[in-house]
């Protein structure tokens, strides 16, 4: 991998350092693309388990915007590991510049295998992931496992770039691996009565019944594509895609937009950790 050069981000230690209740902003080298992020701890009695990445880097003459939300469960070690290693692993793939999609899929798999092999250190927990790579402001690759989501605004219309990996929609895969999907009254469907997503990093005790391969989607960025929103399910449980895009477009400052989205989720009584990144492309 070529040497990386990072720039355009304030509060750098929070951007790539640790989970916290935090906010910050940054921009690309020429200042045309700006981002803001806001993370708010949920009401559950455990430490913040959401981690994120938001930064621009230079590699092989290309400017890459790297954005991610990692929503952990049963501890923060797996999302912290992803924050440190997943993008690095993607960019290390020899074919990344020629075939980003294949490289992303390969790096997701290798990263999950590394997490499982270090489960004695990382614990029994796991994490969802949504990652977005913006190349030279012109092309976007989005990948995800779990229910963290990326939504793109094209002409003001919300376009969901990810697929929510939920147990009831992937029941056949789970049952084909020998697992089951519970559906208890008053609760969401769960893999083996435990996990509310059907794909995740980690979760060694459930891995034989889970998947960790991502869905990947790419899109050209044109003059009609103005905003990208990434968020954990703490936002999406209480807000529709179009609502989030409308807020992010109305508030021109992406930091203020991200804060408004997390604040509105709290107003709507979201109880989970809430993490949001708003990228203003135009």
UniProtKB/Swiss-Prot annotation:
It catalyses: O-phospho-L-seryl-[protein] + H2O = L-seryl-[protein] + phosphate; O-phospho-L-threonyl-[protein] + H2O = L-threonyl-[protein] + phosphate. GO terms for molecular function: metal ion binding; protein serine/threonine phosphatase activity. Keywords: Hydrolase, Magnesium, Manganese, Metal-binding, Protein phosphatase. InterPro entries: PP2C (IPR015655), PPM-type-like_dom_sf (IPR036457), PPM-type_phosphatase-like_dom (IPR001932). Binds 2 magnesium or manganese ions per subunit. Mn(2+) 1 binds at residues 71-72. SUPFAM superfamilies: PP2C-like (SSF81606). Gene3D superfamilies: PPM-type phosphatase domain (3.60.40.10). It comes from the Eukaryota. Its EC number is 3.1.3.16. Its cofactor is Mg(2+); Mn(2+). GO terms for cellular component: plasma membrane. Mn(2+) 2 binds at residues 71, 233, 272. This is Probable protein phosphatase 2C 10. It comes from Arabidopsis thaliana.
